A protein has these predicted regions:
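Catalytic core of soluble alpha/beta enzymes
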Residues: 142, 147-283, 297-309
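Active-site cofactor/co-catalyst pockets and adjacent glycine-rich loops in catalytic enzymes
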Residues: 293
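Short helix/strand-capping turn motifs
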Residues: 286-289
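N-terminal capping/lid subdomain adjacent to the active-site entrance of alpha/beta enzymes
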Residues: 1-165, 172-179, 183-187, 300-320
Length: 320
């Protein structure tokens, strides 16, 4: 039996990017039950990609009973709905066989992953204070994408002088802004910028110098989308809600490596149930941004554990 329902998890603080703010995560939870075993998974439908919670639930409920992971890849397009079911099927298989998902997927035992902790878009002074509070982290990911970005990133560096930095423009720049800011960001020790231009403007990146590595987020979805990014991007951000689950995320990671692209593994604002499979993909990634539940006022039972610099693999009591 396959079920799907919406659940809402409030955040402690608003999360702001160049496109707006969020105060909660409204996720779709899929459950697959067979032969006395139950697996579950989570997806976060994203309006930026034309997804809604209601449409995702309807699509999941329309799936045939007994669907396999292989059949699922053909039955549903990549996205949050398929992610929820794909991860539920992995969890179901692990529980049915009494073996962990990493073993079923042919992976090595997972280790803690160093992650970037995200600083929400705010005033320069507020971002300086947030950076100072998080100066003990290994990596900070700074949300940008407005005309006033230089004072913000300067303030972040003042607040956290030694931390590694990456920035995310969330489609908010033009080629001229990237070209103007890149030398200053490099001076401040920024390692990489995510999605500086809008999805669909990728070709412009092939026409300019990229002294600061550029990561595709909104422009990178599944493995099939990656060859078209060559010559435009240097890094791809793989999120299970974009790839449509763990199955395709592992394929996309392998394809990125084959193409010579660096890999970042990211997430939406979601719970520990979304992080559990993502940690498996993040093994050996160049960057990981898996702090989705870190500021949740409420999370799943048996949540993933964070320390100052890492996310730890999930307990089987949660998933996998």
């Amino acid at each position: 039996m396959i079920t799907a329902q919406a659940e809402t998890f409030p955040r402690r603080n608003p999360f702001t990017i160049s496109r707006g703010s969020k105060t909660e995560a409204r996720v779709v939870t899929a459950t697959v039950s067979r032969d006395g075993h139950r697996g579950w998974g989570e997806g976060l439908p994203y309006p930026r990609y034309g997804e809604t919670v209601e449409a995702a639930i309807a699509a999941i409920r329309a799936l045939p009973e007994g669907i396999t992971r292989a059949a699922l890849q053909e039955a549903m397009a990549p996205g949050a709905a398929r992610n929820a079911v794909d991860c539920a099927l992995w969890d179901l298989e692990a529980k049915s066989l009494g073996r962990p998902v990493w073993e079923l997927a042919g992976l090595l035992p997972p280790k803690p992953v160093e992650i970037a902790f995200t600083l929400s878009l705010d005033t320069a002074e507020a971002m300086r204070a947030a950076a100072a509070r998080n100066a003990h982290r290994a990596v900070l990911k700074v949300k940008l994408g407005t005309p006033a970005d230089m004072p913000r990133i300067e303030a972040v560096r003042q607040g956290a002088p030694k931390v590694r930095l990456i920035v995310d423009a969330n489609e908010g720049w033009t080629p001229e802004v990237y070209t103007d800011l890149a030398p200053h960001l490099i001076r401040l020790g920024v390692e990489m910028v995510e999605q500086p231009l809008p999805q669909g403007a990728d070709d412009m990146l092939a026409e300019i110098a990229r002294p600061l590595p550029v990561c595709a987020d909104e422009s990178a979805h599944d493995a099939a989308s990656l060859p078209g990014l060559l010559g435009k991007y240097d890094v791809v951000n793989l999120k299970l809600d974009k790839t449509g689950g763990l199955t395709e995320a592992l394929r996309a990671k392998a394809e990125a490596r084959r193409l010579g692209l660096k890999v970042m593994v990211g997430c939406m604002i979601s719970t520990s149930l979304s992080m559990a499979p993502a940690v498996l993909v993040a093994q050996g990634a160049d960057w990981s941004d898996l702090d989705g539940p870190a500021d949740m006022a409420q999370d799943r039972e048996h949540p993933v554990v964070y320390d100052d610099r890492h996310i730890h693999p999930a307990t089987p009591l949660l998933w996998g």
